[in-house]
Amino acid sequence: MVLQQSDLLILGVVIGTHGLRGDLKIRGSDQDFPLLSKMHQLVFLREGETVLKCARRKAGWYKGHLLLQIAGYRDVRAVQHLVGCEVAVRRDDVPGLPAGEYYWFQLKGMTAVDRRLGALGCLEDIFTTAAHDIYVINGDYGEVLVPAVKAFIADVDLESNRILFDLPDGLVQET
């Protein structure tokens, strides 16, 4: 079976090796690492072309980066060619979440709507703080930062690609 780019979810980039045993140093976002460290089957891509499909042997953290060790590769020279590759997983392999929980990739790109203000724009990014995630929405109101808390999220509709908010007064600067 040939994998299409749309079948894959890119979770990071190999930025180097670590040690002599073939560990790969991965750069990605805070939202990517927990999922990437759980996935067993990985796909390495360079310029959209598959370089290697393999199983994850081990994953761990080191100085803000994820270290991956892949099955069958125990030497730094054997994995050197993967530096610069994107690390992806098949979307179908991503485990489901309990009702009401979503992966970042399901939310990014959604149309953000507030019950009172109407369309806010597009949910373009998500970042993590000590307290909770923050949704970055860009649109007619400029950049709006919305705390990802249940009190503000009225509904998430994956089928219509829309997230409905019930934002408090003052969170969005109205002109």
From Swiss-Prot:
Record GO cellular component, one term: cytoplasm
One GO BP annotation of this record: ribosomal small subunit biogenesis
Gene3D superfamilies: PRC-barrel domain, RimM
InterPro entries noted in UniProt: PRC_barrel-like_sf, PRC_RimM, RimM, RimM_N, RimM_N_sf, Transl_B-barrel_sf
Single GO MF descriptor: ribosome binding
Xref: SUPFAM superfamilies: PRC-barrel domain (SSF50346), Translation proteins (SSF50447)
Pfam families named in the record: PRC_RimM, RimM
Superkingdom in the source lineage: Bacteria
Domain named PRC barrel: residues: 99-171
Subcellular compartments: Cytoplasm
Main location: cytoplasm
Keywords tagged on the record: Chaperone, Cytoplasm, Ribosome biogenesis, rRNA processing
Domain statement: The PRC barrel domain binds ribosomal protein uS19.
Described function: An accessory protein needed during the final step in the assembly of 30S ribosomal subunit, possibly for assembly of the head region. Essential for efficient processing of 16S rRNA. May be needed both before and after RbfA during the maturation of 16S rRNA. It has affinity for free ribosomal 30S subunits but not for 70S ribosomes.
Assembly and binders: Binds ribosomal protein uS19.
HAMAP family: Ribosome_mat_RimM
UniProt family annotation: Belongs to the RimM family.
PANTHER family linked to this entry: RIBOSOME MATURATION FACTOR RIMM
Name of the protein described by the UniProt record: Ribosome maturation factor RimM
Source organism of the structure: Syntrophotalea carbinolica (strain DSM 2380 / NBRC 103641 / GraBd1) (Pelobacter carbinolicus)
